[in-house]
Amino acid sequence: MAKKVTGYLKLQVPAGAANPSPPIGPALGQRGLNIMEFCKAFNAQTQKEEKNTPIPVVITIYADRSFTFEMKTPPMSYFLKQAAKIQSGSKLPGRDFAGKVTSAQVREIAEKKMKDLNCDTVESAMRMVEGSARSMGLRVEG
């Protein structure tokens, strides 16, 4: 028989930098989970990732206080900022442009994010990436 799920917890943790300090420690501790067990498992799985890349993680919490976690791909804004070589998006998207990305970069980001997006084709994923780029104040060229 399957374990009874008592809840889910969504966090965004830097790759290889999970530690018991806030915000991870209190979020897991409130639910009675072993904080160090999560930190060690997460850091082991994110060793191959670039340091401090934000990794969204969904933790499934079971009634016996055990857990499993599923890692997602980094946020689209992270990839777009890297592609445009900027620190942050525009404060006034649509008026001020913070940078630009090419359609080749958009395709590359769409292919990386494909498994987390709710779309069937790369072209529809590219349209989602282009929309995110515009909302950040980035110009899409090409």
From Swiss-Prot:
- Please provide the record's keywords in A-Z order: Methylation, Ribonucleoprotein, Ribosomal protein, RNA-binding, rRNA-binding
Decide whether keyword RNA-binding is in the record.
yes
Q: Which SMART domains match?
A: RL11 (SM00649)
Post-translational modification here is noted as:
Lys-40 is trimethylated or acetylated; other modifications may also exist.
GO MF terms, alphabetically ordered? large ribosomal subunit rRNA binding; structural constituent of ribosome
State any GO BP term from the record: translation
GO CC aspect terms:
cytosolic large ribosomal subunit
Under the subunit heading, UniProt states: Part of the ribosomal stalk of the 50S ribosomal subunit. Interacts with L10 and the large rRNA to form the base of the stalk. L10 forms an elongated spine to which L12 dimers bind in a sequential fashion forming a multimeric L10(L12)X complex.
Q: Which PANTHER family match?
A: 60S RIBOSOMAL PROTEIN L12, LARGE RIBOSOMAL SUBUNIT PROTEIN UL11M
Q: Which NCBIfam families match?
A: L11_bact
Query: Per the similarity annotation, which family is this?
Result: Belongs to the universal ribosomal protein uL11 family.
Known function: Forms part of the ribosomal stalk which helps the ribosome interact with GTP-bound translation factors.
Q: Which HAMAP family match?
A: Ribosomal_uL11 (MF_00736)
Q: What is this protein called?
A: Large ribosomal subunit protein uL11
Organism listed in the record: Rhodopseudomonas palustris (strain ATCC BAA-98 / CGA009)
